[in-house]
C-alpha cells in the first residue's frame, strides 16, 4: 500500500500482514508528526539531518497511528530489544522499518516480520563482495546487481525478522535461489517474499504461519 496520508487508513484491517510504502517528502508530514509521542519528539530533536528527520517522522508517526487503531486509550511506549530493534511495549503486533534514498517501508504483522528495501540504482561492487566472502550467497548472486539485491534484501529482512540485525554473523546464514525463490537457511529453511516495484527491490520475511494467511501488499 502506497501511503501519502494517514487518512488513507480508515478501512485498514490489521488482522493480516500489511506493508506500507512511504515517499520521503514533506507532503502531509504534519499529519504524521502530530501522532509522535513525547519520547519520539525528544528523539527527533537529536536528529540533525533533514532527510533522517522526515524518515523518523513518517515511519514513527505511521506506527503510532496503527497502534492507536487497536489501542485508542493508550500511549505508545517505544522500546528497543538488546540488539536495537524497536517495538512498542504491550502491543501484540510486530513491525519492521527499512529505508532507501527516497522511500521508506513499514511492515506490520501479528507474527514476527522483517522487511528490507534497496534502490536498484545503487552502486554495488559485486567483485568485492565475492572476494571478501562476507556473505554466504550462492554463486548466482554475483551474476548481476539484480540477483545480488534479491539475496541481500532477503538477508537483511531475515536479520530483522529474528530481531538481531547484523549482530548475527551473516556468514552463518546461507541465502540461495532455489526454483526462482530465495531461501534462507540458518539450520532451518524459510522463504523470503519479494516485491520489485518502482525501481526498488523489497523483501519480506515472516513466520511460516503468516505466509499461509497471505500479506496485503496493496
Q: Whereabouts are the PLM-identified features?
A:
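Core catalytic alpha/beta fold that binds nucleotide/phospho-ligands
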Residues: 1-218
Amino acid at each position: 500500500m502506497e501511503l501519502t496520508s494517514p487518512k488513507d487508513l480508515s478501512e485498514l484491517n490489521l488482522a493480516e500482514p500489511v506493508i506500507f510504502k512511504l515517499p520521503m517528502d514533506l507532503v502531509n508530514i504534519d499529519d504524521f508528526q502530530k501522532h509522535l509521542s513525547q519520547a519520539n519528539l525528544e528523539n527527533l530533536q537529536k536528529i540533525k539531518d533533514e532527510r533522517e528527520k522526515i524518515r523518523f517522522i513518517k515511519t514513527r508517526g505511521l506506527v503510532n497511528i496503527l497502534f492507536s487503531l487497536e489501542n485508542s486509550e493508550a500511549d505508545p511506549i517505544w522500546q528497543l530489544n538488546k540488539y536495537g530493534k524497536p517495538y512498542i511495549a504491550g502491543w501484540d503486533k510486530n513491525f519492521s522499518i527499512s529505508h532507501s534514498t527516497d522511500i521508506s517501508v513499514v511492515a506490520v504483522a501479528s507474527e514476527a516480520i522483517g522487511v528490507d528495501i534497496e534502490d536498484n540504482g545503487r552502486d554495488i561492487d559485486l567483485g568485492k563482495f565475492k572476494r571478501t566472502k562476507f556473505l554466504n550467497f550462492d554463486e548466482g548472486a554475483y551474476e548481476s546487481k539484480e540477483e545480488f539485491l534479491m539475496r541481500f534484501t532477503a538477508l537483511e529482512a531475515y536479520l530483522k525478522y529474528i530481531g538481531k540485525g547484523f549482530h548475527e554473523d551473516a556468514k552463518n546464514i546461507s541465502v540461495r535461489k532455489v526454483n526462482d525463490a530465495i531461501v534462507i537457511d540458518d539450520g532451518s529453511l524459510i522463504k523470503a517474499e519479494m516485491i520489485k516495484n518502482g525501481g526498488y527491490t523489497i523483501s519480506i520475511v515472516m513466520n511460516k504461519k503468516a505466509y499461509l494467511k497471505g500479506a496485503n501488499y496493496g
